[in-house]
Amino acid sequence: MKYYLIAGEASGDLHASNLMKALKREDPDADFRYFGGDLMAACGGTLVKHYRDMAYMGFIPVLMNLDKVLSNMRLCKQDIAAWRPDVVILVDYPGFNLKIAKYVKTHLNIPVYYYI
């Protein structure tokens, strides 16, 4: 199966990497593509965007980087649509991930799971 995961911070990277290891045990042919970090990258697959390029805490930093936030959102939507995974797994990071969930369910009809 093709799995698309999104973890936008260090704790999500940890949980997603553990999930990836478990999925690989059950599905040795698992193919991963993700927004995440170094722990996920160590599990294999394709890192599309590192979380350190996405994480902005607080209202002012988000506003100051709104163009980057929106660009990351567009990149993520386009990448999911182009890769056509069997499932999308979202790990925490609700401000970003819930918008992606709505897009995927509405436009792509791919199953979405929110993990943690």
What are these regions (language model features)?
Residues 2-116:
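Active-site and donor-binding regions of nucleotide-sugar-utilizing enzymes
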